[in-house]
């Protein structure tokens, strides 16, 4: 089961917004991770995507986006969760996907998902026993396989469960138990989180994640010499989407100096002009609705549209090429 590819698809689609340059504003709900969840996330985070599941369920635009980008593997997980006794429409409140490196000098990436809510743990465990599901024991925790999804799950407590491959879950438990450093010691990512975690959908990326994302966003414009010059200045990024009163997207890239931010802004504007030359009507409208600016060592991208325009955008060739 290629959960890493699933994460790439989700993160790309959520940031498609940025890439398409296509999602926030304040909201009644916020997708915030609990302290228990944060303490189990590995230090070497490359990207986190966190979603308020209640907001998603109540937004036609959010559900349309979900339908377009949800990979089959996660649909299998959803089915497996329901069969285990969980009701994702009732029990699930927040959902997060964590892409991380297995070491500070490694490019080997692994992914875990975190679900938060009020879970009927006793009922779920009773169902596992009834089905004679064999658990993998790691110290005081038990990892349970989730049917044909290829993923397994471990419950940190009654409100937090983590799913992924068994090797990744073992690493997460090592982090939770203090055997490996956690997200809490990653100052740059924690700073980025404080800028966005009051939003219903948000993502933060570290230096490597930011440089990879911006290379994808810029497309052919990333091949120019200026990009190589400023790439090393891209130290972090974060974006949010909000589905109340249409769709809104905000992306910020931290460069640390004004010259680098202005250069990336110019490259991004050039990429927008290039895309307008061949884009569909809905794509051109989306690009017209996008503003790009830089200030104080930071690049900012803002996009806002109506639900109906966003629906048309999801069907556009540019969107399809980015999520398939």
Locate the predicted segments by residue.
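Bacterial N-terminal signal peptides that target proteins for export
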Residues: 2-15
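Bacterial N-terminal signal peptides
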Residues: 13-23
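Sec/Tat signal peptide C-region and signal peptidase I cleavage site
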Residues: 24-30
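Structural boundary/hinge residues at secondary-structure and domain interfaces
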Residues: 30-147, 189-229, 266-293, 298-300, ...
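Edge/loop elements at the starts and ends of beta-strands within beta-rich repeat scaffolds
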Residues: 42, 104-107, 156, 242-246
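A short, solvent-exposed beta-edge/loop patch
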Residues: 49, 146-178, 246, 291-310
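A conserved glycine-rich beta-strand in the N-terminal activation segment of trypsin-fold
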Residues: 152-214
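Internal helical hairpin/lid segments
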Residues: 232-259
């Amino acid at each position: 089961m290629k959960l890493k590819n699933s994460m790439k698809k989700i993160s790309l689609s959520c940031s498609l917004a940025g890439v398409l340059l296509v999602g926030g504003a304040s909201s009644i709900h916020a997708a915030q991770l609990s302290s228990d969840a944060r303490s189990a996330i590995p230090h070497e985070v490359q990207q986190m995507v966190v979603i308020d599941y209640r907001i998603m369920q109540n937004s036609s635009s959010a559900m349309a986006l979900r339908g377009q980008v949800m990979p089959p593997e996660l649909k299998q997980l959803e089915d497996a969760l329901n069969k285990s006794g969980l009701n994702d429409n009732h029990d699930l409140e927040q959902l997060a996907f964590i892409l991380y490196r297995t070491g500070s000098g490694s490019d080997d990436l692994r992914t875990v998902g975190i679900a938060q809510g009020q879970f009927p743990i006793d009922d779920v465990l009773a169902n596992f026993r009834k089905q004679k599901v064999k658990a993998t024991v790691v110290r005081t925790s038990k990892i349970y396989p989730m049917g044909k999804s290829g993923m397994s799950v471990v419950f940190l407590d009654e409100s937090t469960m983590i799913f992924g491959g068994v090797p990744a879950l073992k690493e997460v438990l090592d982090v939770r138990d203090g055997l490996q450093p956690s997200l809490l010691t990653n100052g740059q990512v924690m700073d980025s989180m404080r800028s966005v975690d009051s939003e219903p959908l948000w993502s933060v990326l570290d230096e490597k994640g930011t440089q990879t994302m911006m290379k994808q966003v810029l497309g052919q414009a990333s091949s120019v010499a200026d990009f190589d010059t400023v790439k090393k200045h891209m130290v972090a990024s974060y974006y949010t989407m909000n589905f109340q009163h249409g769709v809104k997207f905000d992306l910020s890239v931290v460069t640390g100096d004004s010259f680098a931010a202005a250069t990336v802004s110019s490259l991004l504007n050039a990429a927008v002009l290039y895309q307008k030359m061949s884009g569909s009507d809905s794509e051109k409208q989306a690009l017209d609705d996008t503003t790009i600016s830089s200030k104080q060592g930071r690049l900012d991208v803002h996009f806002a549209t109506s639900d109906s325009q966003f629906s048309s955008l999801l069907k556009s060739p540019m969107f399809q090429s980015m999520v398939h």
